[in-house]
């Protein structure tokens, strides 16, 4: 069946939900972005595998968790979005201080789950506004911790719905970057932490979240850090040194609280506003410091709003 002819019959034997022309703004932490031609919410990993096995091989795919670290353009996405948030959400305590976690589990939930099971080393996940699938994809980290320092093995799936178990040595893992995934996506991971104390870990999480609220614009729509830190420096320091705090384009504003955050002020920004401000910040920093800021955020989709 061609994708243009795909309808609800495509998932007759599936347990998930297939939505058409679905607005994506509500699925992203920036609260911007046009509609997806199709959005699928899988019931579980087996259901996801079945759905993927029936998609046309050339169908554009976008995987979306909490929608942080992503800028969906105003024209939306003309393919199929696979939503993991609220869908692939299983966490299982294993032996040897290990946890198996699915890709749609929020990083904050993972931090609390590990702490409540007297495991330490995962508290930093509480400060990451995304899912574990996204954390695996970019080796997300903060406060001295990185996701891949705990990985024992991962499960991946390809667009044919085929599932593989892979080891860390099969990937090239670096700061905010993981290479070697190919045309596959992370669907779960086995992580090994250290024995700990529940009360100590929960207090550390509480302190981390308090620090985050004090130093980041957590009460405004944002995607998390916009740029990677360059070697030996901080993106926020460079942006602030160029006098860019508070600079705005439309409703998009460089945060006064943390210069490596761009906020959607009171929900008035468009994706085009945010993208233009990202380019402006990169240009000004390059002109004044000769340093090229590299985006952490992924820009996705069609720039032009389509008439449907």
UniProtKB/Swiss-Prot annotation:
Cell wall formation. GO terms for molecular function: FAD binding; UDP-N-acetylmuramate dehydrogenase activity. Its main location: cytoplasm. The active site is at residues 176, 225, 296. PANTHER family: UDP-N-ACETYLENOLPYRUVOYLGLUCOSAMINE REDUCTASE. One of its GO terms (cellular component) is cytosol. Its cofactor is FAD. Keywords: Cell cycle, Cell division, Cell shape, Cell wall biogenesis/degradation, Cytoplasm, FAD, Flavoprotein, NADP, Oxidoreductase, Peptidoglycan synthesis. It catalyses: UDP-N-acetyl-alpha-D-muramate + NADP(+) = UDP-N-acetyl-3-O-(1-carboxyvinyl)-alpha-D-glucosamine + NADPH + H(+). HAMAP family: MurB (MF_00037). InterPro entries: FAD-bd_PCMH, FAD-bd_PCMH-like_sf, FAD-bd_PCMH_sub1, FAD-bd_PCMH_sub2, MurB, MurB_C, MurB_C_sf, Oxid_FAD_bind_N. This is UDP-N-acetylenolpyruvoylglucosamine reductase. It is found in: Cytoplasm. SUPFAM superfamilies: FAD-binding/transporter-associated domain-like (SSF56176), Uridine diphospho-N-Acetylenolpyruvylglucosamine reductase, MurB, C-terminal domain (SSF56194). Belongs to the MurB family. Pfam families: FAD_binding_4, MurB_C. GO terms for biological process: cell division; cell wall organization; peptidoglycan biosynthetic process; regulation of cell shape. Its EC number is 1.3.1.98. Residues 32-196 form the FAD-binding PCMH-type domain. Pathway: Cell wall biogenesis; peptidoglycan biosynthesis. It comes from Legionella pneumophila (strain Corby).
């Amino acid at each position: 069946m061609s994708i243009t002819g795909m309808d609800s019959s495509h998932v007759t034997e599936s347990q998930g939900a297939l939505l058409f022309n679905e607005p994506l703004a509500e699925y992203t932490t920036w609260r911007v972005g046009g509609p997806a031609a199709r959005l699928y919410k899988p019931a579980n990993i087996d259901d996801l595998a079945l759905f993927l096995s029936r998609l046309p091989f050339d169908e554009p795919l976008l995987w979306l968790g909490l929608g942080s670290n992503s800028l969906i353009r105003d024209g939306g996405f003309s393919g199929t979005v696979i939503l993991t948030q609220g869908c692939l959400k299983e966490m299982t305590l294993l032996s040897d201080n290990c946890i198996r976690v699915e890709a749609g589990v929020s990083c904050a939930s993972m931090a609390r789950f590990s702490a409540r099971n007297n495991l330490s080393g995962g508290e930093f996940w509480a400060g990451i506004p995304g899912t574990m699938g996204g954390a695996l994809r970019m080796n997300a980290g903060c406060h001295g911790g990185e996701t891949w320092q705990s990985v024992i093995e991962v499960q991946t799936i390809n667009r044919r719905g085929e599932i593989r178990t892979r080891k860390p040595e099969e990937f090239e893992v670096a700061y905010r970057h993981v290479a070697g995934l190919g045309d596959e996506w992370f669907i779960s991971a086995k992580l090994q932490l250290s024995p700990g104390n529940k009360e100590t870990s929960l207090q550390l999480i509480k302190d981390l979240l308090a620090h985050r609220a004090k130093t980041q614009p957590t009460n405004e729509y944002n995607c998390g850090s916009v740029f990677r830190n360059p070697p030996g420096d901080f993106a926020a320091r460079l942006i602030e040194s160029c006098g860019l705090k508070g600079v705005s384009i439309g409703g998009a504003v460089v945060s006064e609280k943390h210069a490596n955050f761009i906020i959607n002020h009171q929900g008035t920004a468009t994706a085009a506003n945010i993208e233009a401000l990202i380019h402006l910040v990169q240009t000004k920093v390059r002109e004044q410091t000769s340093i090229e800021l590299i985006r952490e955020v992924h820009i996705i989709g069609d720039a032009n709003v389509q008439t449907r």
